[in-house]
């Protein structure tokens, strides 16, 4: 069972106060949807938590909760994991992507007869949500710079994870290829290490333990100053195979593109195994996932195929550039700087836009002029437009790759569906 805030009745084991809070939250969510103000999951959760601050803890009591957190890939991994765990029982998940306490509360309010709660968690809120939900497993995928005006610097965030998770009884499934994640998870009692890769390394050259300069020969990494080093992984991504702890390779056949999703699938298989789901079964179930909240979806705009891609930070843009069709495929870039995106756009200068040289590029969004300056410096030929329809009309033949950050992506989805 997937997660919609109204999808099922609350558990009969809830207190009268908790039941009232759930009912009021669902009513608020319904009003929000009727007013055209989105899914209502956030406002519904806020109302419910105002009435019962302990509601999240109550809703999680009868679930095997799995938390997924990362800078990039957490929504997709949550979707893949929910599908994999359905092999072992019903699942409730915050599929609408609201990953802070209010949205998570709304999702779990629709748990019905679910056995598993598969929950995506914003990095900043991980320790608090872990405290409230008593998870059986926690997946830590990666950490890199993102919304520094809202979130902490990456090492500070890793330190919050390390301190907040140090006493957890959960099994922690952590990416051994990310030094920040490894350092954060090293304080936990039960850790399964996964060699899931790390394409973007610009935030991982300073040792999180002592501040020394990291050495990264081949796939290994270590700090010569303090001895902090990559742990021996239990699971590994090798090519297009997941290698389990026994050394058995299992093929990954996703419909989702790119190496990042092979990495997500590897972590998912490791998490699913904690609950007795065989890697082959988990990977086969992941094959059914075609798109995630609009990501990777292809749509027709005025008769032209447009593929929708989300990129929110330097690491995400780097990964997305590996997915797009080769030049001269047309590319649309859209960037906003609303609160959900982070209002500081200086991160644009950390993205290697030189990779777009040779592509016809069309720039739109609230901060299109900021992006235009960055592309000018990168030597990329571009045209500023006001809408996706205008870009489509001017684009040369070929599939159009549309890359947008968070709120620009949501606006783009609305525009192509209208």
Question: Which residue stretches match the model-derived regions?
Answer:
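Active-site beta-alpha connecting loops in nucleotide-dependent enzymes
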Residues: 199-200, 292, 310-384, 418
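Short active-site oxyanion
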Residues: 115-117, 168-172, 304-306, 355-362
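Short, charged/polar "capping" segments at the starts of alpha-helices
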Residues: 126, 179-183, 339-344, 367-373, ...
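A glycine-rich beta-strand to alpha-helix segment
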Residues: 390-418
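Phosphate-binding loop of NTP-binding sites
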Residues: 6-193, 201, 205-206
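A conserved, hydrophobic alpha-helical segment in the catalytic core
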Residues: 133-142, 220-230, 256-287
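Cys/His-rich short segments
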Residues: 195-243, 252-255
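Gly/charged, well-structured mid-domain segments that form the phosphate/adenylate-handling core
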Residues: 271-311
């Amino acid at each position: 069972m997937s997660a919609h805030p109204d999808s099922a009745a609350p558990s009969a084991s809830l207190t009268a106060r908790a039941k009232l809070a759930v009912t009021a939250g669902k009513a608020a969510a319904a009003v929000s949807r009727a007013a055209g103000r989105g899914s209502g999951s956030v406002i519904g959760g806020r109302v419910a938590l105002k009435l019962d601050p302990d509601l999240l803890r109550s809703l999680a009591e009868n679930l095997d909760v799995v938390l997924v957190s990362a800078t990039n890939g957490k929504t997709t991994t949550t979707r893949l994991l929910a599908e994999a765990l359905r092999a072992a029982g019903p699942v409730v998940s915050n599929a609408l992507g609201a990953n802070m306490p209010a949205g998570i509360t709304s999702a779990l309010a629709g748990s019905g007869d679910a056995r598993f709660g598969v929950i995506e968690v914003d990095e900043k809120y991980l320790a608090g949500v872990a405290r409230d939900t008593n998870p059986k497993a926690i997946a830590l995928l990666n950490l890199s710079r993102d919304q520094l005006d809202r979130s902490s610097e990456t090492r500070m965030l890793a330190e919050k994870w390390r301190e907040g998770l140090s006493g957890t009884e959960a099994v922690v499934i952590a990416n051994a290829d990310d030094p920040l994640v490894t350092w954060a998870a090293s304080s936990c009692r039960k850790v399964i290490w996964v060699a899931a890769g790390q394409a973007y390394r610009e935030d991982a050259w300073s040792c999180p333990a002592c501040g020394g300069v990291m050495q990264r020969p081949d796939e290994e990494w270590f700090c010569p100053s303090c001895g902090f080093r990559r742990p021996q992984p239990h699971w590994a991504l090798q090519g297009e195979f997941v290698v389990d702890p026994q050394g058995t390779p299992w093929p990954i056949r996703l419909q989702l593109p790119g190496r990042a999703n092979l990495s997500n699938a590897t972590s998912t298989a490791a998490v699913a195994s904690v609950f007795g789901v065989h890697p082959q079964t988990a990977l086969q179930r992941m094959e059914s996932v075609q798109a995630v909240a609009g990501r990777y979806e292809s749509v027709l705009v005025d008769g032209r195929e447009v593929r929708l891609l989300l990129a929110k930070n330097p690491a995400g843009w780097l990964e997305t550039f590996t997915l797009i069709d080769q030049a001269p495929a047309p590319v649309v870039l859209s960037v906003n700087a609303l609160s959900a995106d982070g209002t500081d756009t200086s991160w644009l200068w950390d993205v290697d836009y030189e990779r777009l040289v040779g592509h016809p590029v069309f720039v739109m969004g609230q901060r299109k002029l900021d992006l235009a300056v960055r592309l000018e410096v990168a030597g990329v030929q571009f045209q500023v437009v006001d809408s996706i329809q205008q870009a489509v009309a001017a684009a040369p033949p070929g599939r159009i790759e549309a890359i947008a950050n968070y709120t620009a992506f949501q606006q783009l989805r609305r525009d192509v569906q209208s």
